[in-house]
Amino acid sequence: MDLNTILIIVGIVALVALIVHGLWSNRREKSKYFDKANKFDRTSLTSRSHTQEEMVQPNNISPNTYVENGHTPIPQPTTEKLPSEAELIDYRQSDKSVDDIKISIPNTQPIYDMGNHRSEPIQPTQPQYDMPTANNVASMTLEQLEAQSQNVGFNGINSSSPELRVQLAELSHEEHQVDYNLSFNEPKAETTAHPKQTTGYIQLYLIPKSSEEFNGAKLVQALENLGFILGKDEMYHRHLDLSVASPVLFSVANLEQPGTFNAYNLAEFNTIGIVLFMQLPSPGNNLANLRMMMRAAHTLAEDLQGVILTEEQEIFDANAEQAYLARV
């Protein structure tokens, strides 16, 4: 038999011995652990109970012990008898059901019962007092208050207070005072604020001043100078980043039906007017977008010699502009 075979056999035998030794050690440790867990250490229980008894402060003080000069009582601690080992509770034999445990307070009835049945908690009763209402007290005179203050059941108001007398005098004066002021139908200023518009459209119309129609070539040139791009639904749109991929802020439509611009005949068509409109809510800030649409309308009106009208077809002046801005 060669050396390699001998070494292999020796290694296998050593490995088997290690495994057997490990299993035997593990079983021995486990058996020791369970033996210790099943034992009841009465010595530790007795020492722990004695320690708790020693920590108790003496409560009984003899009232008959005095200092001769100061007549001050001297507390005399009384030693309490410690229970003997025979009186200790055997916890292994005192396993009681939780249902039999009751919590009670000395000199009172047991309130809490840990049993299966649940008793309703006792609601504390509060004394009720018959106090006069505020309206009755306010309507009383000084004589009535003084007469009622003598009543045993009413002691909540001090009629001698100067502040109360002043208030009652003012109240009595207001009740007997006659209002001679005549009310006239005077116009009242409207203070109700209009609600902000959050949906729908805001529109501005642009029509020519003198001529009957706008020239198509000039109109297209003016729109492209302001960054409008002909796109969806054959209308001109003002995008956020001046690119088709960005959101639309507001748009321009043709007043003539169907409201579109012919992409193949832009240089030869004429129109009676255009409409600028913004849909709410708009991308970003509605107020900033509305101001931008107003500036575009003013620029187009200057370039095309046109007039701006409101949605009610009235002149778009400074007052109308403020009303538009107040809507958003």
Swiss-Prot record:
<feature type="region of interest" description="Disordered">
    <location>
        <begin position="44"/>
        <end position="82"/>
    </location>
</feature>
<keyword id="KW-0997">Cell inner membrane</keyword>
<dbReference type="InterPro" id="IPR036765">
    <property type="entry name" value="ZipA_FtsZ-bd_C_sf"/>
</dbReference>
<comment type="function">
    <text>Essential cell division protein that stabilizes the FtsZ protofilaments by cross-linking them and that serves as a cytoplasmic membrane anchor for the Z ring. Also required for the recruitment to the septal ring of downstream cell division proteins.</text>
</comment>
<dbReference type="GO" id="GO:0043093">
    <property type="term" value="P:FtsZ-dependent cytokinesis"/>
</dbReference>
<feature type="compositionally biased region" description="Polar residues">
    <location>
        <begin position="57"/>
        <end position="67"/>
    </location>
</feature>
<dbReference type="InterPro" id="IPR007449">
    <property type="entry name" value="ZipA_FtsZ-bd_C"/>
</dbReference>
<feature type="topological domain" description="Cytoplasmic">
    <location>
        <begin position="26"/>
        <end position="328"/>
    </location>
</feature>
<keyword id="KW-1003">Cell membrane</keyword>
<keyword id="KW-0472">Membrane</keyword>
<dbReference type="InterPro" id="IPR011919">
    <property type="entry name" value="Cell_div_ZipA"/>
</dbReference>
<keyword id="KW-0131">Cell cycle</keyword>
<dbReference type="GO" id="GO:0005886">
    <property type="term" value="C:plasma membrane"/>
</dbReference>
<dbReference type="GO" id="GO:0000917">
    <property type="term" value="P:division septum assembly"/>
</dbReference>
<comment type="subunit">
    <text>Interacts with FtsZ via their C-terminal domains.</text>
</comment>
<keyword id="KW-0132">Cell division</keyword>
<protein>
    <recommendedName>
        <fullName>Cell division protein ZipA</fullName>
    </recommendedName>
</protein>
<dbReference type="GO" id="GO:0032153">
    <property type="term" value="C:cell division site"/>
</dbReference>
<keyword id="KW-0812">Transmembrane</keyword>
<feature type="transmembrane region" description="Helical">
    <location>
        <begin position="5"/>
        <end position="25"/>
    </location>
</feature>
<feature type="topological domain" description="Periplasmic">
    <location>
        <begin position="1"/>
        <end position="4"/>
    </location>
</feature>
<dbReference type="Pfam" id="PF04354">
    <property type="entry name" value="ZipA_C"/>
</dbReference>
<keyword id="KW-1133">Transmembrane helix</keyword>
<comment type="similarity">
    <text>Belongs to the ZipA family.</text>
</comment>
